[in-house]
């Protein structure tokens, strides 16, 4: 009989039956505090809470105990039934003493209650209704127009009825003539399409039974997660919760841009004139638009309308890009014209035979296609111009920014090669993990961890001498694992967003400090004087001229150029003619007429030696009262025999 209480206790408390559940529930009702177990990625945490507390209080208790934010609590391990952070629903109505709830960290901005901060009720309802039970971010992402159009497009590849294989009537469909998905491998291989388009890749990932409800692009992290309280900061401590995972580089199967098209060959020819004149390399930014590319299913094409050349110091072998104080002005003019910065272009040309115009082939499969330094520069520029994406955890993923290299091919002719770097390369460059090597331009190098920075291990796979796939540490790293090919071309029928020059001399391009290429008032006067009154819209439709007028300091044209830029964008001659009657443009025309009628003027800036010698001569060189005059525009003191200013070229 002494063993009876022990047997009863084992029967009640150790066996998962009705008696055990009944006794546990009675203890839950009688006790003022109940025990709730919370399972998260860090382990199991026990929370004591009153059964009469609401679920909002439970969320606050979990947040204070685990030091987390942006989470949800679920009843099941597979996160099906969520406990809403309600201020009216009690803990006792949803949970029992000893129950376990499962914590899930939410990506992006969460609509769930995780703190005592007051939320706007209307915003809460909107985010909850628009994206229920989904892992995608709840904030709204404004994608590019071409992305919005492709998201709504059907995307399937239509096929005609095969007269040999199809045995049905014209209205029927079979496996030989039914439409294909845009990611069909046989179609891509047949048409020699190397990479999937970005939207075809999204269609492939969202084609399952759940229709991609939980599909999301996660950002690659190469840094230690900040704020870990389990140990001292790096280098004194690190744990699995804050340590970034090792990265295995894979060749990217998709690309954000499938083709780069220059509207006409004259755009590139004007860019190459600097190299032809000086022999120095040159770099520029591509301005244009994105449009649908029909040759690739759900493809995107970058159409280039102009090339802007920022301040730079170049030699025969190198280019050093300088800070550009007018970068925002250029972007403002481009935006008013319906353009945006879509890529960058640089030259790598060495003359082989100047008499026949051939160049040396210095890039190819036997050497390299793009250097590690250029790859890092492309990654930095792509990080500055991210691609808005509604499937990304932070609202952006990848980039449509392209890289164009002008170099020599096998036939020793000048040709263009297009590239983009992968999302993995962008992450390595963003977190300062990738550097170039000194002796091999085709090899990069992943930094080693130091006291100031922890760098995760980066691996890539290649085949050894016996054909086996082996994993290598990315020290060094062939940059070909980070590249995506993007074809570059020109259309058969040229397109002209801006003026089509025939025999007239175009307006000089900015930041070219050589004779005949300077942008000054004398160049503006000579350029506009070559056009008639009825050709004003054609004369003004030059991207480099519009940028020069926009950033001109002598006349306040910037505040009045809105209608002019709209006229150029819409090619409206009547609206352009209305701009000619504006007072500030009339003043500019009068200055041009006065400058054209004078005998002075200069097309270049005075040298430093001339200025120094003039200053050294002092009052012996000129009489300030009789033999000099002061420019009303730039206040420079000019010699008396000049009829236009030696600095700004404006008339006396």
Swiss-Prot record:
Enumerate the spans annotated as MPN domain. Answer: 260-397
Where would I find the RanBP2-type zinc fingers in this protein?
625-652
Keywords linked to the UniProt accession: Metal-binding, Phosphoprotein, Ubl conjugation pathway, Zinc, Zinc-finger
Per the database entry, which stretches of residues form a coiled coil?
A: none
Q: In which pathway does it act?
A: Protein degradation; proteasomal ubiquitin-dependent pathway
**Which Gene Ontology cellular component terms are annotated?**
cytosol; nucleoplasm; nucleus
From its record, what is one biological process in GO terms?
Answer: negative regulation of smoothened signaling pathway
Q: Which residues carry this modification: Phosphothreonine?
A: 114, 117
Q: Which domain of life is it from?
A: Eukaryota
The record's PROSITE patterns line, in alphabetical order, gives:
MPN (PS50249), ZF_RANBP2_1 (PS01358), ZF_RANBP2_2 (PS50199)
Check the record and name the Gene3D superfamilies matching this protein.
Cytidine Deaminase, domain 2, Phosphatidylinositol 3-kinase Catalytic Subunit, Chain A, domain 1, Zn-finger domain of Sec23/24
Single GO MF descriptor: ubiquitin binding
Q: Which PANTHER family match?
A: NUCLEAR PROTEIN LOCALIZATION 4, NUCLEAR PROTEIN LOCALIZATION PROTEIN 4 HOMOLOG
Q: What does this protein do?
A: May be part of a complex that binds ubiquitinated proteins and that is necessary for the export of misfolded proteins from the ER to the cytoplasm, where they are degraded by the proteasome.
Name listed for the protein in its UniProt record: Nuclear protein localization protein 4 homolog
UniProt lineage: Eukaryota, Metazoa, Ecdysozoa, Arthropoda, Hexapoda
Q: Gene name on record?
A: Npl4
């Amino acid at each position: 009989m002494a063993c009876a209480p022990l047997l009863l206790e084992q029967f009640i408390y150790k066996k998962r039956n009705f008696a055990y559940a009944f006794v546990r529930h009675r203890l839950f009702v009688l006790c003022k505090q109940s025990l709730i177990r919370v399972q998260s990625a860090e382990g199991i945490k026990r929370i004591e809470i009153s059964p009469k507390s609401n679920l909002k209080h439970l969320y606050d208790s979990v947040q204070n105990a685990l030091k987390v934010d942006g989470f949800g609590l679920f009843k099941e391990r597979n996160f099906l039934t969520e406990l809403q952070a309600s201020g009216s629903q009690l803990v006792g109505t949803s949970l029992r003493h000893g129950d376990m709830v499962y914590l899930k960290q939410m990506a992006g901005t969460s609509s769930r209650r995780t703190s005592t901060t007051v939320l706007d009720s209307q915003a809460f309802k909107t985010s909850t209704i628009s994206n229920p039970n989904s892992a995608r971010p709840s904030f709204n992402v404004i994608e590019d127009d071409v992305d919005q159009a492709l998201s709504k497009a059907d995307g399937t590849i239509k096929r005609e009825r095969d007269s040999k294989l199809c045995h049905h009537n014209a209205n029927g469909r079979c496996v030989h003539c039914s439409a294909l998905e845009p990611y069909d491998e046989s179609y891509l291989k047949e048409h020699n399409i190397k990479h999937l388009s970005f939207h075809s890749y999204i269609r492939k990932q969202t084609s399952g039974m759940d229709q991609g409800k939980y599909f999301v692009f996660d950002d690659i992290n190469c840094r230690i997660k900040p704020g870990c309280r389990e140990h001292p900061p790096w280098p004194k401590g690190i744990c699995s919760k804050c340590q970034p995972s090792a990265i295995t580089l894979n060749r990217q199967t998709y690309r954000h841009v499938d083709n780069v098209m220059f509207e006409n060959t004259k755009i590139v020819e004007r860019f190459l004139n600097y190299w032809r004149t000086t022999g120095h390399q040159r770099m520029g930014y591509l301005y244009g638009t994105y449009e649908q590319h029909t040759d690739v299913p759900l493809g995107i094409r970058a159409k280039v309308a102009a090339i802007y050349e920022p301040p730079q110091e170049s030699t025969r072998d190198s280019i050093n890009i300088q800070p550009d104080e007018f970068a925002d002005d250029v972007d403002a003019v481009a935006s008013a014209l319906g353009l945006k910065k879509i890529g960058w272009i640089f030259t790598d040309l060495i003359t082989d035979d100047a008499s026949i115009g051939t160049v040396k082939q210095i890039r190819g499969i036997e050497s390299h296609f793009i250097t590690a330094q250029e790859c890092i520069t492309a990654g930095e520029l792509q990080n500055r111009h991210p691609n808005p994406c509604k499937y990304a955890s932070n609202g952006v993923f990848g980039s449509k920014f392209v890289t164009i290299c002008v170099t020599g091919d096998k036939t020793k002719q000048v040709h263009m090669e297009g590239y983009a770097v992968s999302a993995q390369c962008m992450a390595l460059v963003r977190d300062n993990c990738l550097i170039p090597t000194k002796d091999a331009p085709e090899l990069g190098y992943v930094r080693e961890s130091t006291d100031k920075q922890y760098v995760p291990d980066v691996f890539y796979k290649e085949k050894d001498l016996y054909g086996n796939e082996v994993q290598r540490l990315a020290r060094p790293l062939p940059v070909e694992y980070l590249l995506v090919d993007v074809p570059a071309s020109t259309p058969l029928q040229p397109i002209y967003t801006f003026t089509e020059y025939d025999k007239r001399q175009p307006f000089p391009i900015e930041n070219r400090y050589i004779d005949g290429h300077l942008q000054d008032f004398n160049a503006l006067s000579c350029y506009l004087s070559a056009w008639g009154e009825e050709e004003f819209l054609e004369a003004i439709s030059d991207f480099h001229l519009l940028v020069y007028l926009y950033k001109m300091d002598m006349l306040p044209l910037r505040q009045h150029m809105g209608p002019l830029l709209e006229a150029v964008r819409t090619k409206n001659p009547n609206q352009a003619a209305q701009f000619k009657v504006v007072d500030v443009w009339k003043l500019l025309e009068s200055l041009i007429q006065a400058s054209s009628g004078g005998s002075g003027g200069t097309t270049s800036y005075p040298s430093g030696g001339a200025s120094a010698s003039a200053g050294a001569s002092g009052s012996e060189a000129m009489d300030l009262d009789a033999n000099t005059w002061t420019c009303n525009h730039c206040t420079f003191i000019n010699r008396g025999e000049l009829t236009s200013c030696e600095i700004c070229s404006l008339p006396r």
